[in-house]
Amino acid sequence: IRISRKDIYEISRLGDNINSLLESISVKQISKVSSIRELIHEASILFSYSENNVKEIEEKLVERELIASTYLSKLNIMLLHCRISSINNIRFGYIRLKKILREEDKLIEGAIVELVAEGFKNVHTEIMSEINESLIEKEEFIRILKQKSESDVIDKVEEILVELYKRKI
């Protein structure tokens, strides 16, 4: 197999982005929210560093939700995601609700939060796609998100992304 300098660069970028995502993972437990809008607000706080940043993330998540609902009925979770200018990498987190949120016909146990840098690189999309496919295909991943510790979530995401990395080498 012939490997070019470009291939090495792409593989290195993938590795850097995987490491960055793994370092950013956050799992937060919340006692109660009364609406999807409130859940989105909590999600916007997860990776914020200022009030302006909270507003920007919240606006983008609401904007995305208005395009089409991000509720995954088979999993009883929201998949809150957006592109944002105030970060330069990807972020992944989970908000676990102690009390199920009931809104309209939805029963929501929690929300995955995925932020991708605006002007995102293909590698960001590839990483998030790998995680999202695992949500659908691997029941164990959902169980870990909903019930286990943050370090267990990090370990599972690492396992998923190491497989992606191995396939690319």
Label the predicted regions.
Residues 1-169:
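Cytosolic covalent-transfer regions centered on His/Cys nucleophiles
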